[in-house]
């Protein structure tokens, strides 16, 4: 079939398998052209491995450190008549390229929050890898079925203690509009912490540790975004911020747990990028469009692969890691450069419907958004007939 982008709200409902493969290849080429990661990991588990930062971690490990990788994700395969999810195609492409390079690459499709998927992962590590020396936690999910209670909990993006009104960008209609968010209830805050906080990360490490599949010296990191003053009311000081603070709490006990075997645990803070998750946050498209323009002007613009490869090379496995006073690894320091932030803040209130394309890089934002789904990739013929039914050999699919 010939596949064209069809966007509804903040989701593109079509995906392009050849475009997704080309996107993965671009990221692999970036890593291989920038050289190996000294003293990097060799056997890596990535939880949330199919898109965005998790995919970039899998690529950085496999192609920057010659690591064998096991990826966990929740995606949908395509059929002859309907495209699958971008994450499915990304993972198929990653496995193809990693296998060609002689690296082990296997994937588990299912609910990473569940006890069952944790057990399947442990069994697969025991059978195929023995032990892992790095666990990357990169889940972005709107809801979670708690494995102990069976209750399905949802996360909420809301301020705490006050109503907040801010500028938003309607990306469909390409108009600016004010968005008002009512304060979260305590139940909504608790739900957001349960979905996006550190409990599941802790459960994963506990399960892996008890099963004896963590190597001596094993490291773990969970990816997060903190943002700057302009987003704080709905982010750091809101319901999602409470989940981020929970990560900061949980990492302390995980760090103690791994330190007993010479290992370490860190929260890694990454910059704002276009993802399916960030495009759903009302103020992020405008913020990202302004940020992209400013960072491209200063020559510091980065996407997922540049961020994660740099995090691995400089901080996770580097001699002089970028660490903040909370003990987090920081890869977002170029975004938080005071001059960059000052320019974003200065332009924030001056953007109008008429000058949107002049004051911001909304064009770049839209391109990055479509690239998530395999569109707008250089060298891909989007008029060609493609087969949306792409197999992942050896996948362990717990959803069927």
From Swiss-Prot:
Q: Which catalytic residues are annotated?
A: 235 (proton donor)
- Mind listing the GO biological process terms from this record? fatty acid biosynthetic process
What is the protein name given in its UniProt record?
A: Enoyl-[acyl-carrier-protein] reductase [NADH]
**Tell me, what does this protein do in biology?**
Involved in the final reduction of the elongation cycle of fatty acid synthesis (FAS II). Catalyzes the reduction of a carbon-carbon double bond in an enoyl moiety that is covalently linked to an acyl carrier protein (ACP).
**Subunit structure, as described in the record:** Monomer.
| EC number(s) given by UniProt | 1.3.1.9
Pathway listed for it?
Lipid metabolism; fatty acid biosynthesis
Q: Which top EC class is named for this enzyme in its record?
A: oxidoreductase
Tell me the residue numbers annotated for binding NAD(+): 48-53, 74-75, 111-112, 139-140, 244, 273-275
Show the taxonomic lineage.
Bacteria, Pseudomonadati, Pseudomonadota, Betaproteobacteria, Burkholderiales
């Amino acid at each position: 079939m010939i596949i064209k982008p069809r966007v509804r709200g903040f989701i593109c409902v079509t995906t392009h398998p050849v475009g997704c493969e080309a996107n993965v290849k671009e990221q692999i080429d970036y890593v291989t052209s920038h050289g190996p990661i000294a003293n990097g990991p060799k056997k890596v588990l990535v939880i949330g491995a199919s898109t965005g930062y998790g995919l970039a971690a899998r690529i950085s490990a496999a192609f920057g450190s010659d690591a064998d990788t096991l990826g966990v994700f929740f995606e949908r395969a395509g059929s002859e008549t309907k495209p699958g999810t971008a994450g499915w195609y990304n993972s198929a492409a990653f496995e193809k390229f990693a296998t060609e390079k002689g690296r082990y690459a296997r994937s588990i499709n299912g609910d990473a929050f569940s006890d069952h998927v944790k057990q399947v992962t442990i069994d697969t590590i025991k059978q195929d890898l023995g032990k892992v020396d790095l666990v990357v936690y990169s889940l972005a999910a709107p809801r979670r079925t708690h494995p102990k209670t069976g209750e399905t909990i949802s996360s909420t993006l809301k301020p705490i203690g006050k109503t907040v009104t801010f500028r938003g960008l309607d990306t469909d209609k390409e108009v600016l509009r004010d968005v008002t968010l009512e304060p979260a209830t305590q139940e909504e805050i608790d739900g957001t912490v349960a979905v996006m906080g550190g409990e599941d990360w802790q459960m994963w490490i506990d399960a892996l540790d008890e099963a004896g599949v963590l190597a001596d010296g094993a490291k773990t990191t969970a990816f997060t975004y903190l943002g700057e003053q302009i987003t704080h009311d709905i982010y750091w000081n809101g319901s999602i911020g409470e989940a981020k603070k929970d990560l900061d709490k949980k990492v302390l006990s995980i760090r103690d747990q791994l330190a007993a075997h010479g290992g370490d645990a860190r929260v890694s803070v990454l910059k704002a990028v276009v993802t399916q998750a960030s495009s759903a946050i009302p103020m992020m498209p405008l913020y990202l469009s302004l940020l992209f323009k400013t960072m491209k002007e200063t020559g510091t613009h980065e996407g997922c692969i540049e961020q994660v490869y740099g995090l691995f090379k400089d901080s996770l496995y580097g001699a002089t890691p970028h660490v903040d006073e909370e003990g987090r690894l920081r890869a977002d320091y170029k975004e938080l450069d005071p001059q960059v932030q000052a320019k974003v803040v200065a332009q924030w209130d001056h953007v109008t419907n008429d000058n949107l394309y002049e004051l911001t890089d909304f064009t770049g934002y839209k391109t990055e958004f479509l690239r998530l789904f395999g569109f707008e990739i250089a060298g891909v013929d989007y008029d060609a007939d493609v087969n949306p039914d792409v197999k992942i050999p050896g996948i362990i699919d717990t959803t069927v």
